[in-house]
């Protein structure tokens, strides 16, 4: 316990947290935790304390508004990704079309989000209810395509993992059965390359699992906003927290 709470570890954690918060996307993740944490607590306090329900609602609204400011400019990043998709070898392949729908969905999600912010502060006059619905539709399809693409990539990674695992096992058996010969050094180099490739596949697979969990959690929120399925406020709060924590973990300075 003493080692876990030691000063060097605390300083390292604090340094990583500062680096995370130095990024606008890092601030967005922290604000998202506050936003959906407040939604969850508001649900818990619903039958206990009206005062704390009001406090949590204000925290949720304030955090959500702050996130809209920090997400300004995200359209530019999505625009670059969309343009890059037209430069690939076969831009109209099925997965590339899905990727185009995904990036277009996220692009318009940010556009509508910016317009809502502009309306809220008085720069423009739009129907924020309609903009919110359009934003949710764009977000929903962007997330859905992301999950489909990730599941396809996951299937490929699982096949590679199985193949490489069999190769590594077979190489170990061969090494135990054979005497040391002139090919030992070459075999060791080849085995190391295979093991490195295997480790990369495992890393990629775990990253996909995290992406699916994150996007799946966000999809629950988008589905509720579109009234596809009426998840409870508590479920929405938990989903938002899970998504934000995974996003923060993926951004955490290594």
Swiss-Prot record:
| Transmembrane region(s) | 92-112, 228-248
By its UniProt entry, which InterPro entries does this protein fall under? PEX11
Q: Which GO terms describe its cellular component?
A: peroxisomal membrane
Record-linked Pfam families: PEX11 (PF05648)
| Protein function | Involved in peroxisomal proliferation. Could participate in peroxisomal elongation or fission. May be involved in parceling of peroxisomes into regular quanta.
Question: Which family is this sequence assigned to?
Answer: Belongs to the peroxin-11 family.
Predominant location? membrane
GO biological process terms held by the UniProt record: peroxisome fission; peroxisome organization; signal transduction
Topology feature Lumenal, residues: 113-227
UniProtKB keywords: Membrane, Peroxisome, Peroxisome biogenesis, Transmembrane, Transmembrane helix
Q: What topology does it adopt in the membrane? A: Multi-pass membrane protein
Q: From what superkingdom does this record's organism come?
A: Eukaryota
Q: What organism is recorded for this protein? A: Dictyostelium discoideum
Where found? Peroxisome membrane
Name of the gene: pex11
Query: What is the protein's name according to its record?
Result: Peroxisomal membrane protein 11 homolog
Show which residues sit on the Cytoplasmic side of the membrane: 1-91, 249-254
């Amino acid at each position: 316990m003493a080692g876990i709470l030691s000063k060097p570890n605390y300083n390292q954690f604090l340094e990583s947290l500062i680096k995370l918060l130095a990024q606008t996307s890092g601030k967005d993740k922290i604000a998202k935790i506050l936003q959906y944490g407040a939604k969850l607590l508001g649900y818990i306090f619903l039958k206990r304390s009206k005062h704390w329900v009001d406090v949590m609602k204000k925290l949720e609204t304030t955090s959500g508004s702050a996130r809209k400011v920090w997400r300004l400019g995200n359209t530019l990043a999505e625009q670059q990704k969309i343009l890059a998709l037209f430069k690939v070898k076969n831009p109209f392949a099925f997965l590339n079309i899905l990727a185009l729908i995904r990036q277009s969905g996220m692009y318009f999600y940010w556009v509508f989000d910016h317009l809502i912010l502009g309306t809220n502060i008085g720069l423009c006059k739009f129907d924020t209810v309609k903009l919110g619905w359009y934003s949710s539709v764009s977000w929903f399809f962007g997330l859905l395509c992301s999950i489909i693409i990730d599941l396809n990539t996951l299937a490929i990674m699982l096949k590679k993992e199985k193949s490489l695992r069999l190769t590594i096992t077979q190489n170990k058996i061969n090494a135990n059965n054979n005497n040391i010969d002139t090919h030992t050094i070459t075999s060791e180099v080849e085995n190391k390359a295979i093991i490195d490739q295997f480790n990369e596949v495992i890393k990629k697979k775990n990253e996909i699992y995290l992406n699916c969990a994150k996007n799946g959690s966000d999809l629950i929120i988008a589905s509720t906003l579109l009234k596809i399925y009426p998840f409870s406020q508590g479920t929405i709060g938990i989903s938002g927290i899970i998504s934000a924590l995974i996003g923060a973990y993926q951004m955490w300075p290594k």
